[in-house]
Amino acid sequence: MVFEFCSTSKVTFPGAGVAGICTSEKNREDIKKRLTIQTIGHDKINQLRHARFFKDVDGIKAHMAKHAALIRPKFELVENILTDEIASRGIGTWVKPLGGYFFGFEALSGCAKEIVAKCKEAGVTMTGAGSPFPYKKDPDDSVIRIAPTYPSLDELKK
């Protein structure tokens, strides 16, 4: 059973994007049965708005290229800071994103909540420690999601 999900939620309208599922025909038929009884109806106006905006796959690619141009410098800056300040100290590791909107950062066990609290004291807004986990319950208190998309490049440099 393999399902792949996608969404335009962070691409177009936060919380109002359209979603898609890629799976086998059998899985698709199964999920269609479930969704039929779980929702009153799809937001067809919103679907039309997205179809008209993107037009085709080339429209999606062009829009994503604009996103990349805006956020790539921010991700490169954060990557450089992490490399310069953290890598040699052995106090954390991270996954360099290949798309998406977050760095997955893993601090030493038991430190994530404290790191996020210290960042807040310094005036830096962070995603809550453990946010990738259900109910933010990270058993090791080590995972922080770094989202450099919101602040300006100048703010990130500070």
Question: Can you say where each PLM-predicted feature lies in the sequence?
Answer:
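Residue-level detector of anion-binding/catalytic polar loops
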Residues: 125
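Conserved glycine-rich beta-strand-loop-beta hairpin in the small C-terminal domain of fold type I
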Residues: 65-79, 91-106
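Helix N-cap motif at beta-to-alpha junctions
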Residues: 108-112, 151-153
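Short, solvent-exposed loop/turn elements at beta->coil junctions and helix N-caps
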Residues: 7-9, 91-92, 130-135
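Conserved core segment of the aminotransferase class I/II
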Residues: 3-72
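PLP-dependent enzyme catalytic core of the Aspartate aminotransferase-like
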Residues: 121, 136-158
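Short beta-strand segments
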Residues: 6, 20-22, 96, 102-106, ...
